[in-house]
Regions:
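Amphipathic alpha-helical segments
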Residues: 1-19
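Long, charged, glycine-rich C-terminal linkers/tails
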Residues: 20-24
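Intrinsically disordered, low-complexity regulatory regions enriched in serine/threonine/proline
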Residues: 26-215
Length: 215
């Protein structure tokens, strides 16, 4: 996995929730982001992105630079009430794995990317929200079959979703159409084009925010 691709996965982890106080050094790139800045649903999506970012890197053999310059996220702090008991337990284990510099161990029973996606979906984003980071990571890790499975699952979820004040019927139909287009691209072996597009989107966004410094 190249530095640029890994940085993109990392940028996906930080793109939702930007702030001060935490520094991650990932394969030559310096990124700053704060975990606890806004509403619980944003925190949830951020954590899911962080899981996929770190664990995809671990699965693909990219070592994380957890040097003395890196502040381990204080997952069990003043705001843990937003997670509930299950969330607190998972995040405590995750923090422990980070401190021990062994992220892979955290998901030892889910060594595959699909296992990681399943797990993050279950504990972080159980509703019908568009959990983009999961299939983004699959595409970026060059696992199109995994991305197809996840995108297909999302399409089915959107079809069964009931519109409400936050999600309209038109929005759901748009998501279905977009996801089906991505599936078609991947099935036709066009994953490289989609991967390049995701890289450009994420990397460009991080540059605009001043959160990426080239090594």
């Amino acid at each position: 996995m190249t530095k640029r691709v890994f940085a993109t996965i990392a940028s996906e982890a930080l793109s939702m929730n930007i702030g001060k106080g935490y520094v991650y050094r990932l394969d030559g790139h310096v990124m700053r982001g704060c975990l606890f800045d806004s509403a619980p649903n944003v925190k949830g999506k951020f954590f899911c992105k962080l899981f996929v970012c770190l664990l995809t890197g671990a699965v693909d053999g990219v070592k994380l630079d957890l040097s003395e310059n890196v502040k381990i996220p204080k997952i069990l702090g003043k705001r843990t009430d937003i997670w509930g008991a299950e969330g607190q337990s998972q995040h405590k284990k995750f923090a422990s794995a980070l401190r021990k510099r062994n992220v892979r161990q955290f998901f030892a029973r889910n060594a595959s990317l699909q296992g990681i996606i399943d797990h993050t979906e279950q504990i972080v984003w159980p509703q019908f929200g568009d959990n983009q980071n999961a299939w983004h990571a699959a595409v970026l890790a060059d696992d199109p079959s995994c991305a197809i499975v996840y995108l297909s699952r999302m399409v089915e979820r959107f079809r069964n979703a009931v519109p409400n004040e936050f999600v309209t019927e038109a929005s759901l139909q748009s998501k279905i159409q977009t996801h089906e287009q991505f599936i078609e691209m991947l099935e036709q072996g066009d994953s490289s084009l989609l991967r390049d597009e995701l890289i450009n989107q994420s990397h460009g966004r991080m540059k605009l925010l001043g959160l990426v410094k080239e090594s």
